[in-house]
């Protein structure tokens, strides 16, 4: 939606998308990356920076950002492998270039380990290796190796365990579970507070810039992801 967009044009496409295509239509303002990618790329870039600061592993992050918070099993790093690291980097660089006045502009700067992975062509599924790598063992069976974010070498996967996760096993409601996760006193709780506190603050700052209300941001994220 730009300053010269006619209301009847918006109404027509909103109605057409909803009735004939069966899609949820979200009206966004004409800004770089619109709603979904602006918020989504900030979220994952913020996570990348936090992961390094907290010295967390790929397994730990995917354990904390998958079904336990109502997201798919692919969680964070497996999703990046499927989408392609180069795609993510392209969008992040575009936002960084075209949103110079963003108060969190520095978040869109790529962490060094992402730059190194790009240089080594570790783009994910399309190149056969990314944050995960499937290899054949001597006995003919397959093993999924995990990238060590400190050394950028592959190793056997390690089981991620957190006291906070244990406390949520009996909680079926995701909203109730999320409250317990964010109250955790271990590294998992610290991770949730840092990552989602950052995300929610950023979303609040985008209201009025990328769309009119926070509800439209919710709609775009739910429909798009």
Pin down the residues of each PLM region.
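N-terminal glycine-rich phosphate-binding loop for ADP-containing cofactors
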Residues: 1-225
């Amino acid at each position: 939606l730009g300053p010269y967009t006619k209301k009847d044009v918006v109404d027509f496409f909103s109605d057409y998308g909803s009735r004939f295509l069966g899609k949820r239509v979200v009206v966004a303002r004409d800004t770089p990356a619109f709603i979904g990618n602006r918020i989504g790329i900030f979220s994952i870039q913020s996570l990348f920076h936090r992961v390094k600061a907290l010295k967390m592993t790929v397994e730990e992050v995917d354990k904390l950002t998958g079904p336990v918070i109502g997201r798919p099993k692919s969680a964070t790093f497996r999703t990046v492998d499927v989408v392609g690291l180069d795609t993510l980097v392209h969008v992040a660089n575009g936002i960084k270039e075209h949103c110079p006045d963003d108060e969190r502009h520095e978040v869109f700067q790529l962490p060094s380990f992402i730059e190194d992975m790009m240089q080594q062509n570790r783009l994910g599924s399309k190149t056969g290796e990314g944050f995960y790598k499937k290899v054949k063992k001597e006995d003919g069976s397959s093993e999924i190796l995990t990238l060590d974010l400190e050394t950028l070498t592959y190793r056997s996967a390690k089981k991620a365990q957190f006291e906070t996760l244990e406390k949520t096993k009996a909680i079926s409601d995701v909203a109730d579970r999320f409250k317990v996760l964010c109250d955790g006193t271990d590294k998992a709780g610290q991770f949730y507070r840092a990552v989602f506190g950052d995300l929610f603050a950023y979303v609040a700052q985008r209201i009025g810039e990328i769309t009119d209300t926070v509800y439209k941001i919710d709609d775009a994220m739910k429909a798009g992801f």
